């Protein structure tokens, strides 16, 4: 794992720890946790994640994360594979409708004839 990803994850986990304990998520508190864990990160990460995590309802996010992830992927694949036959069926239906309209015109049964 790259150093940047490790730093990002460390800040995210720090934010989750603070939230779990009911403590307000701030850059200083994230820095304190990281120092206690002997993890060094770029100086901009704690402030960035503190501002980002302060805007998010973390418990709700965690509850909804598992419910839509895997289930959302399967229907997309199924819909994509089903879309091609459905499109072909629509084209065939339109062609048949056009032929029916033409046959009505040939019989002289138009409304304004």
UniProtKB/Swiss-Prot annotation:
* InterPro entries xrefs: P1/P2_N_sf, Ribosomal_P1/P2
Compositional bias segments (type: Basic and acidic residues): 89-102
Q: Note the superkingdom of the native organism.
A: Eukaryota
Q: Name one GO cellular component term.
A: cytosolic large ribosomal subunit
Keywords for the protein's UniProt record, in alphabetical order: Ribonucleoprotein, Ribosomal protein
- GO biological processes: cytoplasmic translation; translational elongation
The UniProt annotation puts the region (Disordered) at 84-113
For molecular function, the Gene Ontology terms on record are: protein kinase activator activity; ribonucleoprotein complex binding; structural constituent of ribosome
PANTHER family noted in UniProt? 60S ACIDIC RIBOSOMAL PROTEIN P1, LARGE RIBOSOMAL SUBUNIT PROTEIN P1
HAMAP family linked: Ribosomal_L12_arch
Q: How does it assemble?
A: P1 and P2 exist as dimers at the large ribosomal subunit.
Question: What role does this protein play?
Answer: Plays an important role in the elongation step of protein synthesis.
Similarity remark: Belongs to the eukaryotic ribosomal protein P1/P2 family.
Its name, as the record gives it, is Large ribosomal subunit protein P1
What lineage, starting at the top, does this entry show? Eukaryota, Amoebozoa, Evosea, Eumycetozoa, Dictyostelia
């Amino acid at each position: 794992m790259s150093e940047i990803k490790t730093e990002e994850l460390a800040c995210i986990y720090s934010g989750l720890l603070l939230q779990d304990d009911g403590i307000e998520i701030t850059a200083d508190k994230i820095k304190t946790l990281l120092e206690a864990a002997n993890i060094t990160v770029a100086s901009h990460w704690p402030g960035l994640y503190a501002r980002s995590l302060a805007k998010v309802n973390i418990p709700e996010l965690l509850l909804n994360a598992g419910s839509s992830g895997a289930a959302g992927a399967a229907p997309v694949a199924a819909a994509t594979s089903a879309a091609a036959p459905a499109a072909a069926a629509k084209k065939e239906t339109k062609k048949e409708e056009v032929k029916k309209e033409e046959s009505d015109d040939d019989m002289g049964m138009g409304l304004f004839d």
